[in-house]
Amino acid sequence: MKLELFRSLWGYAEQRANACREARGAGFTGIEARLPQTPAERRELGALLEGEGLAYIAILFTGGAVLPDQGLTPTEHLRDLERQLDASAELEPRFVNVLAGNDRWSTTQQLDFLGQAQEIARRGGHLCSFETHRARCLATPWVTLEIARQLPELLFTTDISHWVVGCERLLDDPADDLGDFVSRVHHIQARVGYDQGPQVP
């Protein structure tokens, strides 16, 4: 295992050029940031990354922004995923971190959706890691454990703070055995926090 540190631009309000310069200066391997939506913005980011010698982790959302459009179907989310994965290839990301689907879907729907999403990524030659996040598939540890068992090749990005918020506990009880999930974590989004404030801004 090799530890590489990427600076997250989640909530970063300044220009990307500043972020890239700061990341390089601080010794980060690269940045993790939302996929720019226009070709011009992607070209601009690509030039910044190349100029600073930084790697890139692309973040994309299916079916809208952080909170998905509640009216979109799994099929529409899959079409959106495919379109954005094609666009992300322009930046040659190390991998793509995907906030996928909708937590309102049943476990069966989430399994089917994530299986199809995994196949879309495989066909396109994209390495994808699916993030644990409220309002999305993988919003709870219990659904995620079932998905991990049934989709043995699916990789995960963990921001465990979302589960701590949703479950109202640290998930450190022996009964909270997350081993099947932990063994498949590809990417960790670390946060500073405490038991009643796991998402300190």
Please state what every model-predicted region is.
Residues 27-29, 52-54, 92, 150-155, ...:
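Glycine-enriched alpha-helix->loop->beta-strand junction motifs that scaffold or abut catalytic
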Residues 123-201:
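Acidic/histidine-rich catalytic cores of soluble enzymes
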Residues 1-83, 89:
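N-terminal pre-domain/capping segments
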Residues 6-12, 34-36, 61-65, 101-103, ...:
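Active-site beta-loop-alpha junctions enriched in small/polar residues
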Residues 41, 106, 198:
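Glycine/Thr-rich phosphate-binding loops of Rossmann-like dinucleotide-binding domains
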Residues 70-156:
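Active-site acidic/histidine proton-transfer and metal-coordination neighborhood
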Residues 1-8, 31-33, 56-61, 94-98, ...:
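Hydrophobic faces of well-ordered beta-strands that scaffold small-molecule active sites
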